[in-house]
């Protein structure tokens, strides 16, 4: 009888941690409130120990970890090394799906760069303007000659 009492004291929380005194059966019964049915937290183990499902590292967080799962996606750098959707000047993006939506990064980038250093903004703007103007200039010169 003393064993039963110890088992109850060992598992006061709805989510039973993996302890020797905590059998997997009662823990499995209460896995619903502990871990909701979401792709973020697959039912690999019978007892879901982590209440908050860990959010994946990649940029498209909502695709892997939906709002149903209680894991907020942290603010990651808007333009990673492998991401070519946003300019390199982009510091961070309020939305986790920055790689999917380049406009999210552009609007944030202009405000951030303008405040941080106008010199960098002008330099980047000059490069952007030179590319299309240079292309048009070549076409005009070829047509003239």
From Swiss-Prot:
<keyword id="KW-0496">Mitochondrion</keyword>
<keyword id="KW-0597">Phosphoprotein</keyword>
<keyword id="KW-0278">Fertilization</keyword>
<dbReference type="GO" id="GO:0031966">
    <property type="term" value="C:mitochondrial membrane"/>
</dbReference>
<feature type="modified residue" description="Phosphoserine">
    <location>
        <position position="131"/>
    </location>
</feature>
<feature type="modified residue" description="Phosphoserine">
    <location>
        <position position="113"/>
    </location>
</feature>
<feature type="compositionally biased region" description="Polar residues">
    <location>
        <begin position="116"/>
        <end position="145"/>
    </location>
</feature>
<dbReference type="GO" id="GO:0005739">
    <property type="term" value="C:mitochondrion"/>
</dbReference>
<dbReference type="GO" id="GO:0005737">
    <property type="term" value="C:cytoplasm"/>
</dbReference>
<keyword id="KW-0472">Membrane</keyword>
<feature type="modified residue" description="Phosphoserine">
    <location>
        <position position="38"/>
    </location>
</feature>
<dbReference type="GO" id="GO:0030317">
    <property type="term" value="P:flagellated sperm motility"/>
</dbReference>
<feature type="region of interest" description="Disordered">
    <location>
        <begin position="105"/>
        <end position="145"/>
    </location>
</feature>
<dbReference type="GO" id="GO:0007339">
    <property type="term" value="P:binding of sperm to zona pellucida"/>
</dbReference>
<keyword id="KW-0963">Cytoplasm</keyword>
<comment type="function">
    <text>Involved in sperm motility. Its absence is associated with genetic background dependent male infertility. Infertility may be due to reduced sperm motility in the female reproductive tract and inability to penetrate the oocyte zona pellucida.</text>
</comment>
<dbReference type="GO" id="GO:0007341">
    <property type="term" value="P:penetration of zona pellucida"/>
</dbReference>
<protein>
    <recommendedName>
        <fullName>Sperm mitochondrial-associated cysteine-rich protein</fullName>
    </recommendedName>
</protein>
<feature type="modified residue" description="Phosphoserine">
    <location>
        <position position="45"/>
    </location>
</feature>
């Amino acid at each position: 009888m003393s064993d039963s009492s110890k088992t109850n004291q060992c598992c006061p929380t709805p989510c039973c941690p993996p302890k020797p005194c905590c059998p997997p059966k009662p823990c499995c019964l209460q896995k619903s409130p502990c871990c909701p049915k979401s792709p973020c937290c697959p039912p690999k183990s019978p007892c879901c120990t982590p209440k908050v499902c860990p959010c994946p590292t990649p940029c498209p967080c909502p695709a892997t970890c939906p709002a149903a799962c209680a894991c907020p996606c942290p603010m990651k750098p808007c333009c990673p090394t492998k991401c070519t959707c946003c300019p390199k000047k982009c510091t961070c993006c309020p939305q986790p799906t920055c790689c999917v939506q380049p406009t999210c990064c552009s609007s944030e980038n202009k405000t951030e760069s303008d405040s941080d250093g106008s010199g960098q903004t002008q330099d980047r703007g000059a490069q952007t303007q030179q590319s299309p103007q240079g292309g048009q200039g070549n076409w005009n010169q070829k047509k003239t000659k």
